[in-house]
Amino acid sequence: MTREAAIAHALAHFDSGAFQRDVARRVAIPTESQNPERAPELRRYLVDEMTPAFEALGFTCRIIEEPRAKGPFLFAERIEDPSLLTVFGYGHGDVIRGLDDGWEPGLSPWTLTERGDRWYGRGVVDNKGQHSANLAAQASVISTRGRLGFNAKWLIEMGEETGSPGLREVCSAHLDLFRSDVLIGSDGPRPDRNRPTIYLGTRGGASMDVFIDAREGGHHSGNWGGLLSSPAIQLAHALASITSPRGQILIPEWLPTGGLPDPVRRALSGLELDMGEDSPAIDPGWGEPGLSGPEKVFGWSSFEILAMESGNPRGPVNAVPPRAWARCQLRYVVGIEMADIIPALRRHLDRAGFPFVQVEPAREEVFPATRLDPDSPWVGWALDSMRRSTGKEPALLPNLGGSLPNDAFSEILALPTLWVPHSFNGCSQHAPNEHWTAELAREALVVMTGLYWDVPESGIARRR
C-alpha cells in the first residue's frame, strides 16, 4: 500500500462523517478545567472516550495521577519495535468555560453544530479537534500499512487551560516511560489559514498583579479630594511608564538582546497574517517600531494590561478609592530571563518613582519561552512532507505567538518539538462561538497522515 492510499483512507474517513462524529462526541463532554464542579468530566473524557479510542488502535493505556494537577493524565503507547523511531504526541482534553449565554441563538458549547463550512462547539479547535485529527491520521496509516512503522506515545492532559499544573512533574517522574525521538503535536492557529504551518516552540507567558493599597476604606471625594493620594491615578502613571504611548516596551530586560535574530527574521520574511474575516483591523503603528506584524507576534515581546479596577465600576460613589489594581501580562521570546521578569519590573518602577506600587505573580505556573533550532533535520523533513501532501508552501514559525507548556517536552524530556496547528486566528477559541472549518479539518488529516507515513523514511537517527 502507498502513501497516497493512506491519505485517501483519511479523506474517506472524513467524508463519511465518521471524523465529525468523533469530534462531536468529545465536544459533548463539558471538560471545563476552570470549573471545579466539572472535575468528574475531566476523568470521564480520558477513561470513557479517549482510552477506548487508543485501545482500538492497539495502544496500551494508563491513567497517571499527579497531586498538583487539575485532573488526571492519560498515557498511551504502541511499541512496534524498540529499534524504531518513537514519536511523542500531546493533546489537552480540557477546555475553558463554556460561556453558554454568549453563544449565538441555536448554538451550544456542548453540541457540535454545523453551519455552512463551520463546526461550532467548545474545544472543537482547542484542543479536541486537533488531537482527534492526529489520532485519526495515525489510524489511517495503521489501516493502510498494517503498522505505523514507528513507535507512538501519547500524553493527554486535562489542565492546560489552567497553566498545566503538574505536567512538568509528570514528565520529570516518567523520563524513561516517555523517552522518544521527537514530539509532533498540534495546538494553536496558523498565521495564514491557507498555508500549512510548523512552529518550533512558543512565546513564554508571565502574568502579574500590579497594585496599590493606599489605606483602609474610601474617603469622601469632596472632603478629602486633593488631600489624599489617588491610587488609580498613581497606578495609571506607573503602568504608562512600562511602554510608550504606542505600546513599545521600555524595560530592556523584557526584550531580546541584540534585536531580532537573523534566523528568525529570515523565517518570517514574506509571511502574511490572516487574522480572520470577523477580526478587527491590525493597528500598524502599535508595538515595536520597525518590525512587521509577524515579527511583532512571533519574534518579539508584547505587554498587555488585561484588566484594571479601582473603586466600584458598577456603582461609582463620591469617594477616593483606597486601592487600585491591574492584571498585566508579558508574552516574551527566547533570550529573556524568565526569573528576572518581575524583578526587572520592580527595578523599573523604583527608578521611575513608584516604590509604593506592589508587584506579585498572578499565577503559580509560568510558561517559559522555547524554540527548536530551525536547522534541525526534523524541520526540513517536516516541511518537505507537508509540501508533498498539500502542494502548498508551508509556513515556518520560530515559535507560536501564544504560550504552551512546550518546555515540558523540549527541556525536561529533551525532545525536538514540531507543532503543526490546524486552527486559524478567527476561530473564537477562548470566546463564545468557537468554531473550526471543514476545509481546515479535512486538510489536517491530509497533512498529518503524510507526516506519520513519512516518519520511517525520514532517515533521522534515533536519540540514544
Task: Identify the residue ranges that each predicted region occupies.
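Acidic, glycine-rich active-site loops and adjacent beta-strand->loop/helix elements
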Residues: 93-95, 118, 155-164, 186-190, ...
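A short core secondary-structure module
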Residues: 225-246
